[in-house]
Curated annotation (Swiss-Prot):
Gene Ontology process terms (BP): fatty acid biosynthetic process
Gene giving rise to this polypeptide: acpS
GO CC terms: cytoplasm
Subcellular location: Cytoplasm
Family under the similarity heading: Belongs to the P-Pant transferase superfamily. AcpS family.
Name of the protein in its database record: Holo-[acyl-carrier-protein] synthase
Length: 139
């Protein structure tokens, strides 16, 4: 069952200007160390940061809060599986909110899709809840 959907569109050039203006202050406030390493190792650094920015915005919308109720940027982290598929990990208040949304006897799964086409980066997040029995069978 779907328990949350969020989408966001970010301007890559705006993120690039923000990186130039605020540098590490911006990076450290919004992105985890792992996200920073990933983006800084890419040729299209600003596009990588913009996609992750959009993913965090989309996730906060899927959680039904936006960036309120104590949820901070670094409570949501985009990571990639070995296949390259993006995933979202939540901690802190974002994890608490996810727990509140997840029905008893279910496990939450966060699905993430990222894309960019200069000057835009887009993210789409769907949070679903699957019964624990189904989760155990698919593991």
């Amino acid at each position: 069952m779907i328990i949350g959907i969020g989408t966001d569109l970010a301007n890559i050039e705006r993120i690039e200007r923000t990186l130039e203006r605020f540098g590490d202050r911006f990076r450290h406030r919004v992105f985890t160390e792992r996200e920073q390493r990933k983006a800084d190792s890419r040729q299209q650094t600003a596009a990588t940061y913009a996609k992750r920015w959009a993913a965090k915005e989309a996730c906060s919308k899927a959680l039904g809060t936006g960036l309120r109720m104590g949820i901070s940027w670094r409570d949501m982290a985009v990571q990639n599986l070995e296949t390259g598929q993006p995933t979202m990990y939540v901690t802190g208040w974002a994890a608490e909110r996810l727990k509140q949304l997840t029905p008893e006897g279910h496990e939450a799964v966060i699905h993430v899709s990222l894309t960019d086409d200069h000057p835009w980066a887009q993210a789409y997040v769907v949070i679903s809840a699957i019964p624990l029995e189904a989760a155990a069978r698919s593991a």
